[in-house]
Amino acid sequence: MADLQATLDSIYADIQPRIGEGKVADYIPELAKVDPQQFGMAIVTVDGKVYRVGNADTAFSIQSISKVFMLTLALGKVGEGLWKRVGREPSGSAFNSIVQLEHESGIPRNPFINAGAIAVSDVVMAGHAPREAIGELLRFVRYLADDESITIDDKVARSETQTGYRNFALANFMRAYRNLDHPVDHVLGVYFHQCALSMSCEQLARAGLFLAARGSNPTTGHSVVSPKRARRINALMLTCGHYDGSGDFAYHVGLPGKSGVGGGIFAVAPGIASIAVWSPGLNKVGNSQLGAAALEMLAARTGWSVFGD
């Protein structure tokens, strides 16, 4: 671990000439305003050490990475019963595909595509008003990161609400198949706010550390989930965490991870560290172009791939 900062510095040096690559998500107006000339990366090891480079302290919209935290909350509420509502298979389709949902009678393929995450939000809402469910998620993420300064960006949430026609279609579809219990606009209110969580690489790596450490946060002593559940969440991230680029990410990086269209990628080296990288420019399947490149370099230089070095 001693030379981890040197490894990060070398990755940053190699990435530097490429900063600005990829295309910023433009279908959410607030995200279209983000400066693409940014790159940050943070690693938190299971013994609590933090390593960072670049814009690692700049908060960004974590978007779909929030689905990992919502999934953790939903499993805490209903356990394995969740899998009656959502599958565990890679989709191979775009993250907002409607065709697959119709074909499979309103049961989304996995909890990380939009339809699956909307179903998960519906589960978390049980017994809550939308505002309470959003509050529960925010408290949970602050607890995980041990950081009360984490916020939800209302401008981004509003921006998504105004342009999220396809998500409304997905939710109405599931409601028609009786796979949503709450009114569509309530569920999507929660969903758009969870996606608008704003965190820095360091905050994100801290929040996800429990997944690298068998379900407990070694720095705070908080027990979050059982080792078995942490392992299973990691398995889902490895197979389904990057939309229809999941196989490619497993091939090149070999770590469980979850991407978001805000340009963030969260990744886990089980037993070793949690990693967050951010660069707003996306590749054609909606994953951070430089984020994925940096994680591939990290896996190659550390031997952390779950498939061995």
From Swiss-Prot:
Protein name per its UniProtKB record = Glutaminase
Q: How does it assemble?
A: Homotetramer.
Species for this entry: Rhizobium johnstonii (strain DSM 114642 / LMG 32736 / 3841) (Rhizobium leguminosarum bv. viciae)
Q: Which GO terms describe its biological process?
A: glutamate biosynthetic process; glutamine catabolic process
Does the record's keyword annotation contain Hydrolase? Answer: yes
The main enzyme category here is: hydrolase
Pfam families xrefs: Glutaminase
Listed A to Z, the keywords are:
Hydrolase
Q: Which reaction does it catalyse?
A: L-glutamine + H2O = L-glutamate + NH4(+)
Binding positions for substrate per the UniProt entry: S64, N114, E160, N167, Y191, Y243, V261
Q: Which GO terms describe its molecular function?
A: glutaminase activity
As given in the record, the signal peptide range reads none
- Its EC number is 3.5.1.2
Per the record, the similarity remark reads: Belongs to the glutaminase family.
Q: Which residues form a coiled coil?
A: none
Q: List the HAMAP family hit by this protein, alphabetically.
A: Glutaminase
Tell me which domain of life the UniProt entry assigns to the organism this sequence originates from.
Bacteria
